[in-house]
C-alpha cells in the first residue's frame, strides 16, 4: 500500500525520496526549488511505487495500514506513531509475523503531532505539571504501550515495549538521520502549509497519471514562484 491523497500524506511520501537523491526544497538562499533533476527522480520513483500498489487513494496513514493489517498487502511505509494500529486492529492477521526496516534511502522524515500549552491557558502551571507527568520516566512505559511515542529513552529499552513494538528500537536508531521540514526567510509571505498544498496537488497529479512528472514539477515551481514574494534584500 502507498499513501496518497491529502496535503500531508503526499509530501511525506515524496520528500524522503527527494532527500535520498541529495535534493532539497530550498537553495542556499532559501528560494523554493522543486523543478530539479533530484525532484524528478524522486517523483518518478513515487509514481512507479504507486503503480505497483493496490492503487487505492489513501488519504491518511491509518487507512494505508488497513490493507497491510489484513494481510492483503506485503509492505507499506508509515510513520511509527501509526504502526501500533497494526496490532490493535481487529482485522490484523499478521501479529507476530512482522518485519521492519528504516525507510529506503535512509532519509526518514521527523514529524508528528505534539501536546502543547496555548497562550490563553488559564492555568499554565497546572498544564506544565501535567506535561511533566505525561512525559516522565514513570509514565513512559504505559504511555508507549498504549500506542504513544514517549520522548523518554527508557521507553525504548523497556522489554515489554520492545516485545510488543519491536520496530521502536530501529526507529530510535533512525532519529539521527531523520530530516525535518524547515522554513525560509527568502520570502515575505512564506507559509509551509501553503507550500505543501501546492506541492501535494502537483505530486498527486503526476502519481495518478493526470500529467507527467516533468509537467507537475514545472507547474508546481511556477505556482510557488507566483504565490510567494521574495524579500527585497534577495531581489
Across the structure, where does each feature detected by a protein language model lie?
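Glycine-centered hinge/linker elements that transmit conformational signals in sensory
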Residues: 17, 28-58
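Short amphipathic alpha-helical coupling segments at ligand-binding clamshell hinges
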Residues: 38-45, 122-134, 142-145, 216
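Short helix-initiation/N-cap motifs at beta->coil->alpha
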Residues: 56-70
Amino acid at each position: 500500500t502507498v499513501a496518497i491523497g491529502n496535503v500531508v500524506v503526499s509530501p511525506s511520501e515524496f520528500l524522503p525520496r527527494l532527500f535520498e537523491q541529495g535534493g532539497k526544497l530550498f537553495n542556499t538562499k532559501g528560494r523554493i526549488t522543486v523543478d530539479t533533476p533530484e525532484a524528478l527522480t524522486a517523483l518518478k520513483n513515487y509514481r512507479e511505487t504507486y503503480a505497483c500498489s493496490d492503487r487505492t487513494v489513501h488519504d491518511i496513514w491509518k487507512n494505508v495500514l488497513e490493507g497491510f493489517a489484513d494481510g492483503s498487502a506485503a509492505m507499506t511505509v508509515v510513520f511509527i506513531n501509526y504502526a501500533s494500529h497494526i496490532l490493535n486492529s481487529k482485522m490484523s492477521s499478521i501479529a507476530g509475523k512482522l518485519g521492519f526496516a528504516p525507510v529506503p534511502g535512509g532519509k526518514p522524515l521527523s514529524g508528528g503531532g505534539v501536546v502543547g500549552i496555548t497562550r490563553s491557558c488559564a492555568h499554565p502551571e497546572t498544564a506544565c505539571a501535567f506535561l511533566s507527568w505525561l512525559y516522565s520516566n514513570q509514565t513512559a512505559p504505559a504511555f508507549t504501550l498504549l500506542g504513544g511515542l514517549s520522548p523518554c529513552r527508557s521507553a525504548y529499552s523497556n522489554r515489554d515495549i520492545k516485545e510488543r513494538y519491536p520496530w521502536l528500537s530501529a526507529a530510535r536508531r533512525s532519529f539521527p538521520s531523520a530530516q525535518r521540514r524547515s522554513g525560509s526567510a527568502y520570502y515575505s509571505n512564506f507559509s509551509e502549509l501553503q507550500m505543501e498544498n501546492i506541492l501535494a496537488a502537483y505530486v498527486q497529479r503526476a502519481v495518478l497519471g493526470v500529467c507527467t512528472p516533468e509537467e507537475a514539477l514545472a507547474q508546481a515551481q511556477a505556482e510557488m514562484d507566483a504565490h510567494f514574494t521574495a524579500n527585497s534584500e534577495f531581489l
